[in-house]
A protein has these predicted regions:
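A short, Lys/Arg-rich alpha-helix, primarily the initiator
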Residues: 1-18
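Short alpha-helical DNA-recognition segment
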Residues: 20-38
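Residue register of alpha-helical TPR repeats
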Residues: 73, 113, 152, 190-192, ...
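Amphipathic alpha-helical segments of tetratricopeptide repeats
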Residues: 96-103, 135-143, 175-182, 213-224, ...
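DNA major-groove recognition helix of helix-turn-helix/homeodomain DNA-binding modules
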Residues: 47-64
């Protein structure tokens, strides 16, 4: 019963905001503001007459939620899974399907779930003006979110700040995301990998190594070996910063041996050779550094992203 009250209340609340109506405007001549507030917060069951009048003003019908909403909820779960695993074909397919189906959804929880995942989708597409706009809009609804929705919002903020090179803000939000994920029993390896990336930018090598290793073990368990390579690249870079050159050299040589197993072998090889050049530059062996940089250029395409963008592909 309580769940039903909350669902109806949240729908009334959401539709009111959607139509840019104040509580006073919605309830005028129908009920008091305090009574409407209790309805929106699921604290009281509105009489059928009042509910009919409120819905008429909001131009919605007082009916049970359509079955399509459960189907949409399942599809949103699939979309999240595709976004987490960066299955771009699936991401685009589900996005297209949702465009028509979301028009039939009234449920506040489902609409917010969609908007939160849509923001993650925009991050994947690197559409930063749209991401900023969505995050600002979502912020207004934060108090109404479920714990998991708050996690999704916080994670998207962290990713956005990272891609804007605001690393301290990114660390703040990604750290909060990790805490929330542990509290909720939610696991996503990308959270740990992105924490490793942020710590790398902030030059906190021991934390970079910690989170990169956590992410790497997770990816191994999921048989996502291309992402394991990303973690190894980051770990080796941290070893260079810590002047543990032999450890870094061992990792890069291993990556070069394994590169042919992957579809994007040229990209992997280019990054490894580039970073070997950086390693020998730090050792002041400039001849070897130059040799590796020149080898790297044979593989590096003009449109290739820089190192961080290349390893960041799982975000």
């Amino acid at each position: 019963m309580q769940q039903t009250l909350e669902k109806i209340g949240k729908q009334v609340f959401y539709k009111r905001l959607q139509q840019k109506m104040t509580q006073e405007e919605l309830c005028q001549g129908i009920c008091s503001v305090s009574y409407l507030s209790k309805i929106e917060n699921g604290k009281i069951e509105a009489s059928e007459e009042i509910l009919q009048l409120l819905c008429a003003r909001l131009e919605i019908a007082v009916t049970d939620l359509r079955d399509v909403e459960e189907d949409v909820k399942g599809k949103l779960d699939e979309w999240l899974n595709a976004l987490v695993h960066l299955d771009k074909q699936q991401v685009e397919r589900i996005y297209e399907e949702l465009q028509g189906e979301m028009k039939h959804v009234l449920d506040f929880e489902i609409i917010n779930y969609y908007k939160l995942l849509y923001t993650r989708y925009l991050i994947m597409k690197r559409d930063f003006p749209a991401v900023e706009k969505e995050l600002e809009s979502l912020k207004k609804m934060y108090k109404k979110y479920s714990p998991f929705q708050k996690l999704l919002y916080t994670y998207s903020k962290g990713l956005y700040y990272f891609l804007q090179h605001r690393y301290k803000k990114a660390l703040e939000y990604l750290t909060r995301t990790e805490v929330m994920a542990k509290e909720q029993g939610y696991h996503e390896n990308g959270i740990y990998f992105n924490l490793a990336l942020v710590y790398n930018e902030l030059e906190v090598e021991h934390m970079t190594l910690h989170f990169a290793n956590v992410a790497m073990e997770g990816f191994k368990n999921e048989y996502k070996f291309r992402y394991v390579i990303n973690c190894q690249l980051l770990i080796a870079l941290s070893y260079i910063q810590k002047k543990q050159y032999n450890e870094a050299l061992s990792i890069y040589n291993n990556i070069l041996r394994e590169a042919n197993s992957f579809a994007d072998k040229e990209s992997i090889t280019a990054i490894a050779l580039n970073n070997l050049g950086f390693l020998y530059y730090n050792l002041k062996d400039y001849a070897k550094a130059k040799d590796y940089y020149l080898q790297c250029l044979k593989y590096k395409k003009e449109e290739d992203l820089n190192y961080i963008d290349a390893v960041y592909e799982i975000a």
